[in-house]
Structure formats: structure tokens, C-alpha cells
Amino acid sequence: MEQIIREYRPDVKDSTIGAYVRSLTKLNGLLGENPEYTPDKVLPVIESLHYTTQRNILNSLIVYLKATDNPPSKIKSFIEKRDKHNTQYKEEQMSGKISEKQKPNFVSLDSVREMLEKIKPEIDIIKKMPKAGITLNRANRNLFSAYTLFQFYITAPLRNDFAMMEMTTRRAYNKLSLDEKRHKNYMLFEKNKINLMLNNYKTAGTYGEKTIPMDKKVERLMRNFVKVLGYKTGDVVFPYSSNTLTQLLIRTSKKYINKKIGTTMLRHIYLSDKYGESKLESQADAEKMGHSVKTQQDVYVKDPNDFQPIEDHLENDPPLPDFILADDSPEIV
């Protein structure tokens, strides 16, 4: 299935291929043995799912059916249903109101900062562990990773572009061929600055290579992070798949403030906090985040009056589970 889609759409990102495969796997699970991709079989089993989940499944199915040379007549009903969900999504986003599904986890940017203050004492302990001769376990590494990612995302909320990002230098980066650059994102360390070099991201076909300067406060944290974790040039800084990266953020925020905040929600929070009442500087942020101002205003900016309060919450359950690390993550070629 994956290979068929990859051959049909060779220029699509690995993460997009993975999303197609996950949606089709979910559909196959609902259909049972010997799944039949016909409207009378597919539409009833997905009807109870949220409309955006239905849309994603249908979109993946349409791609697969086209890739396997099915006639337009077999695909027509799926396209019509998918397009209806797309229209619903667009109307919901343009309303300026956060969706009912997202609303419980929609908090202010200050609430995210408060969460990071709760985590900081644990991070201070983790930073001292290597000097004390204590090896960081996966829970330590995951928490430090989540903390560092959150600190960056509240200054420039990218998508999941940190997933499998490689640490490099200016000299090493300049030696890469265009093809080598095209398939990866890099964290470029220089003497007085760190830049993110984005080549493999959702809208790369429109915006090309993007250079994102790192905020100075976050830069200091990032240098400390790579030092404590022992990373060097050529290493993957955040060895998580795209899905695992956002799940790491969601599980961390759930543990500390009982909210599920992933990368998409962070984009809503950041832009709603900044532009919900003012559109100043929106063009600069749209360029940085790799989308148009129209997408920014229509999709991400929400009414800040919908921000939800957070609880004084810290679950007394075991540490965050171990996440998939680099050896289990999709290979980038």
C-alpha cells in the first residue's frame, strides 16, 4: 500500500505518505477481513467518526484508488463526500471560533508559559545529571525534549518540522547537494546564532528553503540541551517521527495542566493570542510559519475569549512512556 502510493505521488513528503497509510489502516480495521472499497461498505463504517477524520480517511482512499487505476465512477461518491467535509471545515475555520472538539484544550499563551514554569525545576535537575555521573533515561530525555520544543514553539510555532531534524554547521550544510538538502530539515549551529534550515515541510513546494532564526533565549536553552544530551554535528536532535513528536507534546501538557496541546493547537494558541485582536505583523509570521496570511487568518487565528482556564494539575501516574526513537522512526532518504 505504501509503495503504491509512493510511486503514484513521488514528490509527497514521507510524513504525508505515513498519514495516508495510517488512515487506510484505520479504515481496513473498520471494514474487517477482505475490505471492499465501495461507497455502500465504506461510508456507513466511518459515519460515526468526527467529520475531519472522515475527510482524512476519504482523501487517503481517493489517492489509493487513483493510484490503483480505479475508474472515476468508483471514486466519485468518495470525492463528493470528502469535498462536503472540506467545505464544512473551511466554514468552521472562517467563523473565527474554535471548534467544539478543540475548545477544551484551547488555552492562552500565558497558560503554556505557566506550564513551562511548572516543568522547569525538573529540567534544572536533569541539566545537572551528567556532571553528577548520572545517565539520563528516556523519561528524562523526553521531558527535556518536550520542554525545549515548547519553549521554541511559543516563539515560532512550526508544524512537526523538528521531527528527525539534523544538527549541522554552516560549512557542513554548504557542502550538501540540493538533493541532500531537499529531503531533510537542519538545525544550523554558528558561533553567535542558530538557524533552522527548512527544506522538507508541508508547503515547501510553494515557499522553498526557509531560514528560521532562533530566538536568543531559546538558543541558549538549545545549546544547553544538545550539550546535556551529548549531541554533535550530524546527530538527529529530536529523534521522533512527526506523529510521535506531537504526541510527546500532548502527553506532556496533559500530565502538567490536563490539556492536550500538540503542534496544531500551539499554532492556534500563538496566532490567536497575537492576532486575535490585532493583525499587526501577521505577514512576517505567515512567512516564518510557511503559509499565506489568508490561511493564517482563516485557519489558525481564533477568538482569544475562547481560551480555557487550566487546572492546578499534576497527575500522580508513572513517568511519560518511552517514545519511538530514531531507530524506529521512518527512514529519510
Language-model segments: which ranges?
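Non-catalytic DNA-binding core/recognition domains of DNA-processing enzymes
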Residues: 2-86, 214, 248, 264-268
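Basic, Lys/Arg- and aromatic-enriched nucleic-acid-binding interface segment
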Residues: 114-161
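A short, glycine-centered helix-capping/turn motif at helix boundaries
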Residues: 142-146, 151-181, 277-280, 289-291
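Conserved tyrosine-mediated DNA breakage-rejoining catalytic core shared by Y-recombinases
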Residues: 165-216
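Active-site/catalytic core of tyrosine-dependent DNA strand-transfer enzymes
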Residues: 207-270, 275
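C-terminal catalytic core of tyrosine-transesterase DNA break-rejoin enzymes
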Residues: 265-292
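Catalytic-site neighborhood detector that most strongly recognizes the C-terminal catalytic loop/helix
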Residues: 276, 287-317
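C-terminal secondary-structure termini that scaffold catalytic or DNA-interacting sites
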Residues: 309-333
